[in-house]
C-alpha cells in the first residue's frame, strides 16, 4: 500500500526543505508549494491526502 500523498505549503524555503527532508527520511510521498496559488494548482491536479500549511 502506498503512503499518503502530502502537499507541503510553506513560503520559507529553509523550513520547507526541513519538512521535506524529514518526509524523505520516512519514505513519504510529497509535493511542495511555495505560495497559495501554487498550492491550489497542486491540490486540484494531484488530490493529496493531507495538506501541511
Feature-to-residue mapping (PLM):
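Conserved acidic carboxylate
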Residues: 10
Amino acid at each position: 500500500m502506498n503512503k499518503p500523498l502530502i502537499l507541503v505549503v510553506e513560503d520559507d524555503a529553509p523550513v520547507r526543505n526541513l519538512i521535506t527532508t524529514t518526509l524523505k527520511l520516512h519514505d513519504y510521498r510529497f509535493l511542495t508549494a511555495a505560495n497559495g496559488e501554487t498550492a491550489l494548482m497542486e491540490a486540484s491536479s494531484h488530490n493529496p491526502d493531507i495538506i501541511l500549511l
